[in-house]
Amino acid sequence: MHCPFCRHPDSRVVDSRETDEGQAIRRRRSCPECGRRFTTVETAVLAVVKRSGVSEPFSREKVIRGVRRACQGRDVDDDALNVLAQKVEDAVRGLGTPEIPSHEVGLAILGPLRELDEVAYLRFASVYRSFSSAEDFEREIEALRAHRGA
């Protein structure tokens, strides 16, 4: 790694620690040329493969934006959305693959969203699962009632 101060092409790792609940590694480095220290953070890139085949990095912000639309007019605060996005990221990282289909991200959103707000869940599920009739909504509401009773 190049030193950000003198651009020397090498550096020595002084200390390494896990951070962000094990999702990243923070390294303290020292430049052998100028002697200055700097910090780097390394994370494994999780790629989402869209239906078109295009791959893009996983984005918590994108998850939050999509869920926020479903929560419009509901009493759901930003902290709850951030927690939901973290749960979704943990779930998709837990699959253990570097690339995940966008469909799997949608599935990972449904569970935590159902626990957060049932109306927002129905809104999100209706778009995600392409509801086309009132019967689709009725089936999903029955499934919600069964889940609540379990």
Swiss-Prot record:
Q: Which UniProt keywords apply?
A: ATP-binding, DNA-binding, Metal-binding, Nucleotide-binding, Repressor, Transcription, Transcription regulation, Zinc, Zinc-finger
- Signal peptide range in chain numbering: none
What GO molecular functions are on record for this protein? ATP binding; DNA binding; zinc ion binding
Manner of cofactor binding, per the entry note: Binds 1 zinc ion.
List the unnamed zinc finger ranges: 3-34
UniProt keyword Zinc-finger, yes or no: yes
Query: Domain named ATP-cone: which ranges?
Result: 46-136
Question: At the top level of its lineage, which domain of life is listed?
Answer: Bacteria
Name a biological process GO annotation: negative regulation of DNA-templated transcription
Query: Which cofactors does it use?
Result: Zn(2+)
User: Which is an annotated Pfam family here?
Assistant: Zn_ribbon_NrdR
HAMAP family this protein is in? NrdR
Functional summary from the UniProt entry: Negatively regulates transcription of bacterial ribonucleotide reductase nrd genes and operons by binding to NrdR-boxes.
Tell me its family.
Answer: Belongs to the NrdR family.
For this entry, the protein name equals Transcriptional repressor NrdR
Organism (species): Mycolicibacterium smegmatis (strain ATCC 700084 / mc(2)155)
**Organism taxonomic ancestry:** Bacteria, Bacillati, Actinomycetota, Actinomycetes, Mycobacteriales
